[in-house]
């Protein structure tokens, strides 16, 4: 009888261990539950679009008015710029040119800006810029060239430390048909 009692207790303990083991998953939970990030918070695209367009206009006004401080605020320190003539420049060169007023104009209109929001910290804007009565001094010369006309632009903005700034800019002149004004 003792053997039977020992066997019954052993079977009971074995059964309890098996039941407990069955309650705990031997397989890792599905990764789609464990690895899925929480739903992203909604990006306020309207606010980003408004801020980027505001900065775009401030930048044009800064160049037009010779306001180097305003241009400094809009441009990131590491901005990469492709100018309408295909040359490249950096922030320091642009700020120096603005301070020296190497470019003058009656107006610089930003038309048809279209902002594409990539995420909460990155966006780009495309559009047209129209410069009226624009003149640019030729470096190392007393000559000026007429820069009046219509341009297409692509400017990339990034929010860093809570502040939006232009990190890349590219401007292309649009050829005008003879006798047409922008």
Q: Residue locations for each model-derived region?
A:
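A beta-strand edge to alpha-helix "cap/lid" segment located at domain peripheries
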Residues: 24-73, 80-182
């Amino acid at each position: 009888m003792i053997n039977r009692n020992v066997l019954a207790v052993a079977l009971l303990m074995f059964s309890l261990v098996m039941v407990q083991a069955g309650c705990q998953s031997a397989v890792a939970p599905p990764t789609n539950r464990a690895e899925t990030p929480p739903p992203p918070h909604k990006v306020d695209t309207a606010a980003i679009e408004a801020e980027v367009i505001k900065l775009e206009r401030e930048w044009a006004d800064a160049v037009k008015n010779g306001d180097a401080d305003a241009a400094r605020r809009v441009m990131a320190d590491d901005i990469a710029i492709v100018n309408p003539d295909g040359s490249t420049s950096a922030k320091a060169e642009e700020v120096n040119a603005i301070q020296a007023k190497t470019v003058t104009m009656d107006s610089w209109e930003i038309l048809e800006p279209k902002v594409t929001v990539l995420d909460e910290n990155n966006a780009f804007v495309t559009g047209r810029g129209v410069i009226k009565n624009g003149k640019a001094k030729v470096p190392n010369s007393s000559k000026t060239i007429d820069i009046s006309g219509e341009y297409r632009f692509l400017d990339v903005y990034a929010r860093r430390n809570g502040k939006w700034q232009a990190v890349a800019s590219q401007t292309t002149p649009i050829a005008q048909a003879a006798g047409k004004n922008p």
